[in-house]
Each structure stands twice: as C-alpha cells, then as structure tokens.
Amino acid sequence: MIDVNNFEYMKIGLASPDKIRSWSYGEVKKPETINYRTLKPEKDGLFCERIFGPQKDWECHCGKYKRVRYKGVVCDRCGVEVTRAKVRRERMGHIELAAPVSHIWYFKGIPSRMGLVLDMSPRALEEVIYFASYVVTESGDTPLDKKQLLSEKEYRAYRDRYGSTFHAAMGAEAIKKLLQDIDLDKEVDFLKEELKTAQGQRRTRAIKRLEVLEAFRNSGNHPSWMILEVLPVIPPELRPMVQLDGGRFATSDLNDLYRRVINRNNRLKRLLDLGAPSIIVQNEKRMLQEAVDALIDNGRRGRPVTGPGNRPLKSLSHMLKGKQGRFRQNLLGKRVDYSGRSVIVVGPNLKMYQCGLPKEMALELFKPFVMKELVGKGLAHNIKSAKRKIERVHPEVWDVLESVIKEHPVLLNRAPTLHRLGIQAFEPTLVEGRAIRLHPLVCTAYNADFDGDQMAVHVPLSSEAQAEARILMLAAQNILNPKDGKPVVTPSQDMVLGNYYLTLEREGAIGEGMVFKDANEAILAYQNGYVHLHTRVAVAASSVNNVTFTEEQKSKLLLTTVGKLIFNEILPESFPYINEPTNSNLEKETPAEYFVEKGANIKEIIASREEVAPFSKKILGNIIAEVFKRFQITETSRMLDRMKNLGFKYSTKAGITVGVSDILVLGEKDEILHEAQAKVDNVIKQFRRGLITEEERYDRVISIWSNAKDVIQGKLMKSLNKRNPIFMMSDSGARGNASNFTQLAGMRGLMANPSGRIIELPIKSSFREGLTVLEYFISTHGARKGLADTALKTADSGYLTRRLVDVAQDVIVRQDDCGTDRGLLIGAIKEGNEVIESLYDRLVGRFARKTVKHPETGEVLVVENQLITEDIAHIVEKSGVETVNIRSAFTCNTRHGVCKKCYGRNLATGTDVEVGEAVGIIAAQSIGEPGTQLTMRTFHTGGVAGDDITQGLPRIQEIFEARNPKGQAVISEIDGVIAAINDVKDRQEVVVQGEVEARTYAIPYGARLKVTLGQPISHGKELTEGSIDPKELLKVTDITAVQEYLLREVQKVYRMQGVEIGDKHVEVMVRQMLRKVRVSDAGETDVLPGTLLDIHQFTDANAKVLLKGKQPATARPVLLGITKASLETDSFLSAASFQETTRVLTDAAIKGKRDELLGLKENVIIGKLVPAGTGMNRYRKVDLVKTTQDNMNVENDEVYVEQ
C-alpha cells in the first residue's frame, strides 16, 4: 500500500481496455445480485465473491475454509480467496461489451472532445453513435469523402452503385475506426499551418482542436480509448445492497444501472450468435449504448432512466457532483469521532482559557485516557474491567477523569464557522449539569449568545495535536481579529455598562472633596457609606503605585473618583493611571491638571471643574489594544478577566434598569411636525402648479421629513439627563443607539415599502405614545423585509466565502523574501473629500519598498525593507507625506504563494507572519465573515439613474466575479482634454482631444457627467458617474491600475458599512484573479495561441526560447472572476471538488494532468497533512522534547526543537 504522506503527485488519464482488464479480478457475466433465500451472492453476478472477495473475514463462500490460518488459500470448491472482507471495497470487476460504446463525457461534454478530434459536429456524431446515419470510414475510389454522413437510403444507393469499394458503418464501432485512423502528428502540423492564415471562427475552432490534439499527443492517451470495449465494475461495497426489516432489499441505484447494461449486453451476444437481422442487432446496440450512457451520466442525453416513483437514478457522475457528492461530502468534510455537542450557557467565573465541560460528556470523550489511567493506577486489572468500571460509573472514575483532563485542551466550535476564531482551544473544567460553559468574552469571536445556541467539542488526541491546540489555538492566544488586527475580545453589554458606571463622575456627590492617604482608605470610606463610587476625591499620588508619575507629581494629591481608583487596579503596574478617556492619557501619562499641591482647597478646585466623561466600550477596546501592544498575550488575558469581573460586579451594584418613566416625550415635537407639514404642503402646491417634477417633489418631501426627525433627535439628546438609564446604555456602547431612543421618545420617521422605496408618509408617533393602526401596518413592512433579507444574506455570504476560499486556498507564505524590485504606491483612499481609509491604516504592518524622507527636512523616516510600526506610521502621516511605496502581495514574485516581506505583519498575532501561514484562507475568511453584516438591498431613492448603484454584498460579488457592473461608467481610453460636450438627439457626446487623435464617447441616457469642458483627463478615468468595468480598465491601462481600482472599490463597500478589513487580505484575493495571461502570439515557443496560462508558466516558456535566441511569445493579462479562477487552477482535484465536476475531470483526463498537491484542498482530499503551518516539510522533521520544570515557568514555552 502506498503511504499517503509519501507520494509526490496524482495523475489522471484515459484508461485503455487493457488497463481496465488489468484492474479487474474477473468478468461479471450475470445481472443477478444476491440469492434472496440464502442471502449469499450469486456466482458471476454483481456481488460475486469469487471476483470481489469474501463477504465475511477469512471465510470462503462454501464454508470449506474458515479462520485466519488459511489466509491466501483459494478454495477448490467455490474458487473464493480466503482474505479480509474489506477487499470488497477495493477489488473491481469488468464487463466485456459485445459491441464498442462511446463514453458520454467525451462525446457529449462541451466542447465535444470526440467532435474536436475528428473535426465532426456533435450533431453528426450523435447520428452515427445512435444508429441514425452511416459514416464513411474508407472512401476507396468513390467520390465520397471520409467522415461523410449517409442516410439509410443513400447508403443503399451507393452500395448498389459501387459495391464494396467503400466502407461505411454505424455506431461507436465506426467512430472507433475513425479515431484509430487518426495521425496526431500530421493533424497537429496541419493545424499549426492553418493558424498562420486563419481568421475569425475558423481560427477559434482550429485553436480548440489544436489544444485537444496536443493534449492527446503529450499525454500518451490514445483517442480511440474514448470508445469503451470493456466496462469497469466498481467494488460492491461502494454500491451496497442491504436487507431491510421485512425481507425487502435496499440497493444503490448503480446496481440497477449495471443490471440494465449486463442484460442488454447478454441479449446482444445471443443475437449475434444467432445471426439475427442487422436491424434488430442495431437496435440492441443502440440500447446498450444508452444503458452505458445512463450508467456513466444519467440524464445527460435524453430522458433520465427512472426508478420507482419516477425518481431519476443516481449515476456514477452524480456520485461525484454537488454537496452530497463524493468530493464535498466524504473527502473534504468527514465526520470525526471523539466529539460531542451540547447547549452553551455562560460561565462568568471561568478564566480566559477555560471552558466548562459536562461530566458525562467528558467521561465519554476521554474514555480511552481514563481506561489507561485506571489500569496504570492499579484500580483495574485490564482494559476490559476498566471499561466495565466506567460504564457502571464507579466513584473513583471521577477522580481519574479529573487528573486526565488536566492540561489536556479541547476544541470548541460553533457553526457556522465563518473565520478561524470559530474554533478555539480551551482547558476543560468539569461542571455539573448537561450544558457546556463558555467564557463570556469569547462570545464575540464565535458570534454566540446564550439563547439556546449549541456548540461542538472535539478532543485532540496525539501529543502533537495537543501542543498545537495549546500553543496556537488557546482562546487566550486569540485576542486579535485576523481581519483588522483589532482586539476581538472586547467586553460587551453588562461588562461595558458596569465599567461605565464605575468610572462615572457626579457633581456634588456625597463626601465630595475628601482627601485620602491611599486607595484602600478611599475604598473603606466607600464601603462604609462616607463617599460614593462617583464622588470626586483626592488621594496622595505617592500611594498610587504607578511608574509613570514623576517625582514632583508623587509629592502632590491626585484628583480622581473612588470608581476610577478601583478601575485602575486591574491595569498593569507600568501602565499610565487612566483618569480621562483620551488617547494621550492612555498612551503617554496622566494629564498634569489632575495633580494639585497638598494643602490647596480641594473642594473649591473640584467644584470649579467639569465632570469627566466615563469610559465607554470604545475606550475599553483602546485600553485592551494598548495593553496588548505593550505586554503581549499573557498579561492581556489576565487583565481581560479582571475587567470582566469588575464589569459584572458593578453592573449588578448599579442596578440599572429601564422603565416607561425613563422615556420622556419631547414637548416641542408637535411644533416641529407642524412646521414640516407646512413645508410639505407648500411643496405639493408647487408640484400642482407644475413648477417641479414628480421626482423633485418626492425627493423634497423625503428630505423635509428626514430633517424633522434629525431636529427631534438633536433636541431629545440635549434634553436627556446623563443619568438616564437608556442614555447610559447607549452612550456606554452596551446596547442601543441614539436612533433607537428617538423611535422610543420622538418619532419613528420614514419607512420603506416592500420594494425598498421610501414611503413619503412618515410615522409621526413614537413607541412611547403608541402607533395608530395604519402606522403600525406600515412599520411591519420593514420588520418582515429585514427577516427575509437576513435569511437570504446568510446563504449568499456563505457561498461568497466558499468561492473566496477556493480561489485563494493555495496561497501560503512560502519564503522569507522574494527579492522583487517592484512595489505598490499607496496613499489615503478618498471618495470626494471624505477619507475612507487613511494612509496610517494602510501603512501599519507593511514593509517599505523605498526609503521615505520628510518632505520638508529631508530626514529619513523609514528605510527600504523596514517594517512600518504604528509609531512610524504616525510620524509618516504627520510629516505630510502623501504616498509611500510599500511591498505588496500584488508585486510579490513567489510562486504559489507570497513571501514574508511582501505580506508584512500577521494581523492576528501582531508579529511578523511565519513561513507556512495559510494567508489565502485567512484573507478569504476575513472578507467573507463580515459579508453577513453588509446590506443586501440596492437603495432606491426615487429611481434616479445615477443613484441606483449596487452596494453591500451584491457589489462585493460583482467586484470579485469581475462582472459588468450595474450603472457602468464610460471611461476615456486616451490622455487628453475634454474638448467638447455635445447634445445629440436625447443624449450627450463627450469629445476627448489627445496629442495624436480625438475620441468621441456616446454617453448613455440618464448617466451623469463627471467632467467639465476643458478639464484634463488621463486614460482609464471615468467620464460619467458609476462603477468602472475592470475588464475595460485592463484593456485601457495596466495590471497595477486594475489592482488598485479593485482594492479601492472593495474597501469602499466595507468601510461604508463600518467594517474594517486589512488591505492585504483584498490584495491576496485580487492577485489570484490576475494570475493568468492569454497567449496572443506563440512566437517560437511550444505554447498554443489563445490558451490561458499561469504568468509563471508563460515566463518559463519564454525564458527557454530566449536562451536559444529565438522569438518569445506575447500575451495579454486576463482578469478572471473568482469562480472562473478557481476552475482554471492547475490542480484538477481542487477544481473538481469546487464546481462543474464532470467538465473538470473530462478535461484533466484527456490532458493526462498531474496534480502536484501544492494547495490545501488537494491534500485534504487524498488525506495528506496540509502543506501549511506545521504540516510543511520544514516543520515535519521536528521532535517533541520533554522540558524540565525550570523552564516550564514561562507560560507557553516553545515546544518545538529542531532535530
């Protein structure tokens, strides 16, 4: 048996008849399956034991030989070999066909491969194969052409006239004869000559034929093998037959299809032996052809063969296709043992890296470990008695279980797993009950809540797997989100509210202005009711143990509140004392104004100052990010746990609740609405007089009501008490926002109707006042559309992620530096005057391609190939530099992946990316995961043409599939000046005057111009509003412009929705879309014109001929959508498991393709370790070394040591 981790590539090809016979263990001659009385397989039937092996281990059919000792003996009575029953999963049989039949994949696929080889149309082929026409196989000395079709009548006429000087025949035999006669070399040379002159359709056809013929010539497949003489029969265990209760049998559809083939084949043999009339034989041959077609691909031609209840039978092709097919069901997704699932509940007392596992579940999952330990401790004599003990749940089992699960991480996964944080490792602790306990801070990453969600548990078994789980996957390690490098474990809801309440300040609170010698005294005073958490007090600065205070500050008093003293205790010692929610306080030190001299009048000073704002969710996030930046993972996870505990404790103490009395209705509301209504009446008057159009009236009414709502919202927010519980919830970022509050207390505002158009009648009531029946009805549209949208969006977003993963799955960091001399020039991304993504955001974590100097002083800010950190990026942005040349995945020279320098920092760890990181998958997940947050709808604001641009998820799909966008912009193909804008009939024309020529562009009706007369314009820039078609842009400009455009557009969509994604993820995806070139002229290379080639293959082919001083080939870059790009990948396994399985496999078989197993999917399919991360060769030769207790003190010590 081949060791799965040791072979280099996998090859697919056409099977010759001899090859099929060599696989086979015997011929299947009868259609019988199982004898229904003895339940034994029939001899020579589809389940025959002599051919396929015994049904029971080490036992022949007749029972003469039983037991292992006869291993390998072939029984002299029944002829069955004594061996394991499992060989019935691998031994094949065959059927010798009485007449050749064509293989439907090669005859019916698009384009028809047989048709291309023979230069016949698929129609003609069909007529010959299904016995409707004769084809001339040898013309002899008659005026007939070879391959000419003849009807029955014509054939008879020619037979009478010329006798047997020519040969014509029907069916697959005739095609086989033609295929055998073909001389590949001659045909190829002939086509190459023809290509030099051919144009138009003849050229395309010639290129297609050349491709197929070259494929046959290079692969060693013979075209005649597309016609089958021998049909392989797959092993019986792969098409099982099982007895149901009640004596009936359930069988795989394949058995029915094979039975039909065998029946017809046997009938044909009998007819041939009897010498039956040709018309009967022909009919039988046609039926045999159809039976084989149905077996290989049922329903591809004509009506599918149906089983009971008119259900089409599943043929061999259907076994591979689709979500339920072999590829996606069994090869890419397998069920695993040592797993369980249960409902999750919150575990607020867990540490960051812990989870609670129900006792019963843990016992079942860790059974083998517990049994071994029971035997090891002498509590059981052997494994069997240990198993019995566990089944009877002896008390000592629990103690052993406790010791077994210590330090043994488990993986928790919640479906849908949208990104890598959907599976994380935890240390289990045993809990009573039957629910899994989950740490509240990891909920964001899993997108989990406790309303009945379920999660799955998996146990990593081997010590390597455990080490990987602990080092790479522990929840405490996964603090940053891979998509943007921001902390993903920020406190939410109650935790935010508690910390917000804790850091509030209140004027005139009890005990204001008291002075304490240290924090403990202040907390004691609070516990005894002398001061409140919100009271502003003074504490001796020297008692607050903080490294950032200067000596002078330590001699003064620090003005703060009791709550903030408590809050600051959770932060690391060398962190600034945080007294106000500002970045300067967070990153540098506590502002000096909070320190006052001892002996000053504290009460007066405090009374004269404004209240300082409390800490909202955003500030807490910034604190976490800053702690992570300075102290790395261990300290951060400890601090997070402390922050969580504080939050829960003080939100409980605060007792913040919501009642109807908290919602105060605005007094001036009626006035504002009256004013708005008067304006609306005025607009309607103008419309009736014909002064404005229907569109303008609609737009104005909408904007009047929107403004009215905004005014009400503004006034509400001003009139709100800062202590109002609802305000506190929304201000802290725990739940809700200003707009929710406006709907409760102000007015609901405008609603959209089911088609998405805004209804111009606003809902004037608020929820506090109550809605009228009509208002309630209108507002139900929106709610229902929301639900329907969400359901559709989830499916769409999931499919987008699947396509993204597929196209980028083989992008892995392969080397340290590719040594490229190209880079990408980047600046801030702007839309009009609004900055969508700042230069700072785009620079952090990238390597500089060229040295960056200060524009005024000329001082060097960044040197070439230096990593740009946050601090450097700030300096660069402040210095006024507009653009920086950086290393980018776009310009990386690495084959099948990227290098460390071009990729930059790994956002998930905040450190340099490691060789072996699967950055393609990370990129796909980072773009796909927020997909569900994007909107579905195209906004209709009264149907103005320019406004109906696609946004949200549909726009992302449009970009990545490289489709022609809706509302496409007209672009200029030359550099020049706008010379004229003319009105022609009902539309406009724009004339661009270049240096050499002028170009005229017709502007489609309803499009809005973006240019003015006399304005200079460069090629590839828009003349009208709208989205550019990237394929057009590629024709007019170069790859770089298209890459930048696509990157900019994707970022625009996500940032508009408030989702941040690192540029590098989009770069990886766009790079995969631009991998291929189309050869326009082959020069003296051996590539074929018109074919799609990988850029690297193309440069290799050219390098070969240039060394000999010959003519190189030329090619144009091609932009492929992600679906097309996935199907064009070099790996046929990856493409076949994605979509269009049969087409991909047909093509691969003819070309005799080799799959070099470079990507992840191919290796998952054949069961190898994936070539990423620790599965890479450079990490495979690694041993685990036991470390002594001394160096175990460092948490998460390096476990890997090179051999």
UniProtKB/Swiss-Prot annotation:
SMART domains: RPOLA_N. It comes from the Bacteria. GO terms for biological process: DNA-templated transcription. Binds 1 Mg(2+) ion per subunit. Binds 2 Zn(2+) ions per subunit. HAMAP family: RNApol_bact_RpoC (MF_01322). Belongs to the RNA polymerase beta' chain family. This is DNA-directed RNA polymerase subunit beta'. It comes from Bacillus mycoides (strain KBAB4).
